[in-house]
C-alpha cells in the first residue's frame, strides 16, 4: 500500500521520548511539566456536569452548523468578561483545536500558501499544516528579559505567499503573552500586507503573577481580520 508523501514523517523514537520510556519502564517518577490533558491531572469534576448529561433533552439531535446556540452564547459571555463583545453568529464550535486549525488553513490558504508561526512554538503545527498542504515559516521570538515578538523580523519573513500570522497567547512553551505594543505592531503588519491574524487563546486564563494584565488579543488588535479560538469549553474524557 502506498501512502501520501505528506505523511512521510520521521517516526523514529527521539532522545527525549526514549528517556521518558526508559524511566517509565524502570518505575521511576516522571514530572510531566507541559501536561495539558485534564483527564490525567486528578481533577474532581463538579457532579452537576455529569448530571446534565442525564437530561432527556440531551438525546434530542438537532445539528447546527456553527454549534449549539446556547453553547456559542456561553462563549460570548466568557469573552465579555475579558472586555470583548461578540455575537453568537461570530462563533463556530469545533471538536478540537486541531480541527479548528485545519478549518482555518483551508479557509485562508491555497496549496503552497504560507503562514508565519512563532518559534519556539507548538510542534503540532508542523504536522497539521502538512496535512492541509500549507507551509509554515518561522518567526523567531526574541529573548531579552523575557520573550517578545520581533516585528521587523516578522516583516522580513513575509512573502507574497503569506496568508496569516498565527500566535498562541500565552505562547506554548515559552509562556510569553502578547503585550499591547506587540499587538499594535502585528496589527499594523497585517493591515499593510492584507494578512489574517490567528490567535489561539487556550491558555488565556492561566497567567502568572498579575493575571489581570492578561487580556484577549482582540482588545488590542483592532481593524484586522482576526480569528481567535479556545479549547476549554468542553468536558474531557
Model-derived segments and spans:
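Short catalytic/ligand-binding loop motif for oxyanion handling, primarily in non-cytosolic enzymes
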Residues: 26, 39-43, 174-175, 193, ...
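Walker B catalytic acidic pair
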Residues: 201
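Residue-level marker for buried hydrophobic side chains located in beta-strands
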Residues: 169, 197-198
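Conserved core of the PLP fold type I
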Residues: 58-188, 205-206, 210-224, 228
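Anion (oxyanion) recognition and catalysis
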Residues: 24-25, 130, 191
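PLP-dependent aminotransferase class I/II
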Residues: 226-237
